[in-house]
């Protein structure tokens, strides 16, 4: 529902192209969009029913601004600028950096080759990124052996170790001609761009010559270099007839999600690929999200632009090319078209996979919870609450509540209760008293605060706990929540549910669940979780009470001093280990600190 302020602004919208900026209650830009007609597009957010991520966006909008431009192309360019500036939450967001290394030929008087994770705009040469760090290291090592540049810090006044190994041109002790570097760099670039035939020929000739000169170690080194090329470079599948550095983008949309696939072609080979999945804010214009992704993709710190970008039809190639500064094309036939379709198929495959995994997850969560409700003959409910009690021969009795929503634990909703009733022995009457107290406290509070009740209560126990819970709900609170008990067998293993409502004249019945079903697994998981939560809380409570009792026995230590020690140290062991000075830092006087040390 649009506010009066927004309604008034909607009446003033022009029929022009431009960008709109949606803002939240704090004035922060949470979404940037563009349109050929601002009036129609912006009004659509508030004048029609929204679903999914777009509905979430609309709920947060408290204001908006517009910027008009003269053409759709200008609005696209402006949108990219605004997204970079504001990084809005509801626009496609990309993490910075790729984490993959590049091979760099540095832009220096005495250049060197090295691995780097950072791309600097210094006009150096960058090749990559390489998804396999070890392959990148091996390639760099090969280059440094075959076409050495500078490997030392330079200008040392004496030859470095690498010079003696033939892996440095000698900048360490002499001036190396620029032409010598240029010659090596041309060969390195040719190799990294996929032209390896000449390299293999040169290495074969050197290996043959070394063998003829009886330099067998050197011949073996050339042999290993040839082997590296054959195993690491040549084994990569050639998927293009030219060596143009090319990135291929395509996308697939389903169920308000977009899947984007990126292929990186280097040296006529598919170097690597990336997949990104995002929920769409504007499902009517997925192309906008796709183009925004590409622009942000190359705006990241460690991205090197290729020579060419391929995109599907329906994209404003001219505007995108202006943003990127490289050619953007849509092939109509041939090998490039096939690669573009391959990217689309892979994008679809990834999104289908995501939905299948979600479906499998739902079977284990929401589907499992439905099995429990079906077994009890109840309509599906989203929320299950479960109780368990814990005490040691009646000492420090506590109860714990866990909540499962659609088959998943909702730990923010867990609650712990210190029971106030006096318990002398662990028997049936104690369980009844504990159950009645915690159920009364829990649901009387929900009634008082007008909060939503659960759809099912599962008691960790049998008829005793179920009867006590139902008696409080029906006869004291007048609340109609289904209650079932999780019953264990003689081996303390969950066996079945017990369900019915004696307050309504229904007999409690045993309800079996298939031990191999997801519903049975969820029931045991709930039982284990509430038991764990209750036991953990009881141990802490018991330890704290035992510590308090021990401190109460020390003469001169009253409730205030005891609480100071509990807050500072938390355990009897730590208090014992504390020095006089540390005890005084906790707020005790010197005589009190000395008394504590002597008493413990």
UniProtKB/Swiss-Prot annotation:
InterPro entries: GIY-YIG_endonuc (IPR000305), GIY-YIG_endonuc_sf (IPR035901), GIY-YIG_UvrC_Cho (IPR047296), RuvA_2-like (IPR010994), UVR_dom (IPR001943), UVR_dom_sf (IPR036876), UvrABC_protein_C (IPR050066), UvrC (IPR004791). The keyword DNA damage applies. It is found in: Cytoplasm. One of its GO terms (biological process) is SOS response. Transmembrane segments: none annotated. Gene3D superfamilies: 5' to 3' exonuclease, C-terminal subdomain, GIY-YIG endonuclease, UVR domain, UvrC, RNAse H endonuclease domain. GO terms for molecular function: DNA binding; excinuclease ABC activity. Its main location: cytoplasm. Residues 197-232 form the UVR domain. Residues 15-92 form the GIY-YIG domain. The UvrABC repair system catalyzes the recognition and processing of DNA lesions. UvrC both incises the 5' and 3' sides of the lesion. The N-terminal half is responsible for the 3' incision and the C-terminal half is responsible for the 5' incision. Belongs to the UvrC family. NCBIfam families: uvrC. This is UvrABC system protein C.
